[in-house]
Amino acid sequence: AQRTPAANIRNWCLARARHLDGSLDATRFNTHRINKRQILSGPISSAVSILRVLLEPTRAEGIDTHIAFNFSQGQKAGLHIRNCVAVPTDGSSATNSISCELAVWADILSGSTTLSQAIAASVLQIDGNTAHALRALDCFDVAGLRS
């Protein structure tokens, strides 16, 4: 970090080193915060594809699950979790599907509610192999999906 001319990299490396040695508490910077308004105002595809960068590869080992997300007005997106990566798709030929309103999905991603609460309230339905879908969604660094 001390030898690179790139200020952003240097600052990131120094802040990370200080966090690791205990002289700086940077845990709040390592928490992903998803804003409900951003999910609701953006395209449907981004409401699902945002998860691709939140996958924890070690938790996704051995998973090969394709999930379609069906939202109101026939809007659809998909995510295929395989080889420890999440690949956005259009949802066609998915073996599992999740159906809910976009607002419910935004609540789950933003932490206002959890996946299990949405299922219990019957505002979200999973078709196909529920256990595989839940295990795949548990691989993401989103508190609302780990329930």
Task: Kindly give the residue locations of the regions a language model identified.
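Feature captures hydrophobic
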Residues: Q2-S147
